[in-house]
Amino acid sequence: MYFKDGFRDEVAIIGMGCSKFGERWDTGLEDLIIEAAFEAFADAGIGPKDVQVAYFANTAAPNNCSGTPVADALKMHGIPITRNENWCTAGHIALINAVLAVKSGMCIPAMAI
């Protein structure tokens, strides 16, 4: 999904986080999400309670993780968390949905996980 004029002057990425790379077979999916999310919160200077909507990218996780366990782990209750599953492009789809949510005026900020 591409837009002719883009959103350069209207939407910004204010924070970014990433879980540590490596063979971490003993680390669960939710722990990896928490690690990346709290790094992004610190980078943006916001907390979980500031997020108004979130889009969770899932790539065929064996436990079929929905947005609800993520909401519980991040203490992000009372907001919509939409799960996107689209194999290798799941993260891209989550980011596009977060951009569209902000662009539409639905919320500020949105989060792509």
Tell me what each language-model feature is.
Residues 1-83, 100-104, 111:
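Conserved "HGTGT" condensation-loop signature of ketosynthase/thiolase-family condensing enzymes
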Residues 80-93:
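Cysteine-centered functional microenvironments
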